[in-house]
């Protein structure tokens, strides 16, 4: 992963805009069947933990199963597009739900008082087998990743507007913003459900890490203005502001806006008008010669 990924395998600007609005992006069925079959034995045996902040190349050396997975071009390209070429491993975990077993998790976000607004972690979720509704695919609420919560602070809420349940074919990889609201479901099927998660920390500034050839595409704005079941008129406008702020951070374009929201926030003129009623204020020097 230390090597730069070929540009053709990086995410596009439209895909990045989708991630910014949804808080997730899925790559369905991209892992080869042979790797999916091997994954079951690997996950059953468990994968040794690593200390927080371990460089990727140290955590998953070449020749390991996980390295083979994340070196797949589409997966490597997505990781680099989100967190850069040399991310660190925050942590990883194997999640296996037995048949007819487990309990549904409360809704939560994988972040405790994470105040970063100019960076984010990416979480990879790999599903080596098909996930059906009966198997209890991960529940999430698209677009909630920019609404800051303290991990399980929303756990008492159920059946949120706009929530979705993941179903996917074998070999699917999903990448999430660390702040998205989600929760695992119980498995009501007769087969175990497998998922492997890795959380990546960026080690470089997250600035135009993807393929920006289509950055002026109309599709970018369409993705950034997507609405969900919970984004009514009031909440929807606030979410457009949140997305525009993140897009400015990711692109370095400090003039980008959706509608006029962020531009309006900058309207704080310092020029004192001629004839200000409080003589203690004086007038800006540039007003001299205006008359009256």
Locate predicted features.
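Non-heme Fe(II)-dependent double-stranded beta-helix
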Residues: 1-116
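Short hydrophobic-aromatic micro-motifs
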Residues: 26-27, 126, 174-176
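A structural signal for short, well-ordered beta-strand segments
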Residues: 92-94, 124-126, 196-200
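Catalytic core of non-heme Fe(II) oxygenases with the double-stranded beta-helix
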Residues: 103-167, 205-214
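Short, solvent-exposed loop/turn segments at secondary-structure junctions
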Residues: 148, 182-184
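Conserved metal-binding segment of the jelly-roll/cupin
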Residues: 167-182
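Non-heme Fe(II)/2-oxoglutarate
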Residues: 185-292
